[in-house]
């Protein structure tokens, strides 16, 4: 039986942004905090960004250079980040990952309930998906199904927010076991597990099949173009 609700991560799962997000965020931090450290020091050096939320990345980066975290400043940095991302995303390194386009098209044709469950801020998510023409498959407005960085720094809060919005849209409480989270990192797996959702992990990010299996994903595939992925998601 196909899952009633499918929640997709973005980076490493649907698209590879070619480093656009990192470049844009470093630009934004330099713009707002350029007098804090020497420019040759990378703002995000040492941070393992895979699966981190945008807000948590900013917090960790600020603390890493000895700058006290400030909620208002974090918001301004992320607004500027989205401005810079509009330009950076046009770089040549961007690509839609294997199997994504036909899978989303088939899910749309079958009227499957899909949503986003990502550490991106809303605007950043839309920019990254729009570059590959994938934004049309997801909703970003009130009443749509999504979880973004604005819902919390911890990814499990984002999964929980997506489930709440799905419940509101469907007019009934969605049990976490009815949803399938699709992601590419151990953080995706841990967040889904914390909320009680099963997980399909795809090895199109930085983690291979063996690593994702070791993290306890319910299903692990090399790419979303695998034939049994369609069978699992489409029933």
Whereabouts are the PLM-identified features?
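Metal-dependent phosphoesterase signature
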Residues: 62-102, 110
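Short acidic-hydrophobic, aromatic-tinged amphipathic segments that line or gate anion-handling sites
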Residues: 147, 219-224
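Active-site neighborhood of HAD-like aspartate-dependent phosphohydrolases
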Residues: 1-45, 50, 59, 63-64, ...
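Substrate-recognition "cap/lid" segment bordering the active-site pocket of phosphatases
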Residues: 92-95, 121-180, 186-195
């Amino acid at each position: 039986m196909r899952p009633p609700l499918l929640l997709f991560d973005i980076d490493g799962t649907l698209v590879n942004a070619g480093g656009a997000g990192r470049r844009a965020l470093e630009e934004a931090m330099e713009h707002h905090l350029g007098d804090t450290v020497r420019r040759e020091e990378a703002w995000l050096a040492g941070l393992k960004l895979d699966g981190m939320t945008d807000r948590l990345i900013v917090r960790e980066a600020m603390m890493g250079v000895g700058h006290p975290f400030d909620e208002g400043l974090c918001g301004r940095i992320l607004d500027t980040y989205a401005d810079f991302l509009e330009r950076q995303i046009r770089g040549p390194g961007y690509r839609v990952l294997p199997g994504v386009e036909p899978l989303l098209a088939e899910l749309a044709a079958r009227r499957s309930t899909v949503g986003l469950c990502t550490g991106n801020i809303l605007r950043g998510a839309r920019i990254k998906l729009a570059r590959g023409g994938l934004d049309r498959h997801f909703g970003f407005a009130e009443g749509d199904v999504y979880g973004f960085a604005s819902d919390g720094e911890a990814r499990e809060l984002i999964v929980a927010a997506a489930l709440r919005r799905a419940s509101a849209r469907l007019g009934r409480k969605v049990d976490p076991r009815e949803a399938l989270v699709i992601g590419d990192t151990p953080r995706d797996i841990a967040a889904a597990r914390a909320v009680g959702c099963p997980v399909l992990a795809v090895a199109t990010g930085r983690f291979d099949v063996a690593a994702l299996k070791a993290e306890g994903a319910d299903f692990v595939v090399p790419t979303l173009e695998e034939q049994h992925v369609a069978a699992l998601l489409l029933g």
